[in-house]
Each structure stands twice: as C-alpha cells, then as structure tokens.
Curated annotation (Swiss-Prot):
GO terms for cellular component: cytosolic large ribosomal subunit. Belongs to the bacterial ribosomal protein bL35 family. Keywords: Ribonucleoprotein, Ribosomal protein. GO terms for biological process: translation. Residues 1-16 have a biased composition (Basic residues). InterPro entries: Ribosomal_bL35, Ribosomal_bL35-like, Ribosomal_bL35_CS, Ribosomal_bL35_sf. One of its GO terms (molecular function) is structural constituent of ribosome. Residues 1-22 are annotated as: Disordered. It comes from the Bacteria. This is Large ribosomal subunit protein bL35.
Length: 67
C-alpha cells in the first residue's frame, strides 16, 4: 500500500478546529472588486466553515488531521 500523504495545497488553505469542523477562507474577494458593493465585500471578510457534504473530501486530502 502506498504511503499516505497530505495534499499540501489543502493544508495551507484549511484549518481544523478542535470540534472537528474545518475553517476556510471566503471566495470571490481577490479581484474584480470594483463591481461589488461595500456591503457584499464586508460580508466576504473573515472565514467560513466547510459544509458537511465536503468533509469526506477533506478527510482524503488531510489524512492526518483527525477528521
């Protein structure tokens, strides 16, 4: 069986919280911000949580995260 490896791109983008949920950054805030309203950009600040339907993929990408 091959060695399990962590997907480094995922390890840099996600953090596992103590409760087992995964924290992620918001999308749609890197460029083309002039057409977005101030309210829309304000709501894109901060972080969000990965949805339960994607947690299986997270466990595959981060095998040592304890998910």
């Amino acid at each position: 069986m091959p060695k399990m490896k962590t997907k480094k791109s995922a390890a840099k983008r996600f953090r596992v919280r103590p409760g087992g949920t995964v924290k992620r950054g918001q999308a749609f805030k890197r460029h083309i911000l002039t057409k977005k309203s101030t309210k829309n950009k304000r709501h894109l600040r901060g972080t969000a949580t990965v949805h339960e339907t994607n947690m299986g993929h997270m466990a595959q990408m981060l095998p040592f995260a304890g998910l």
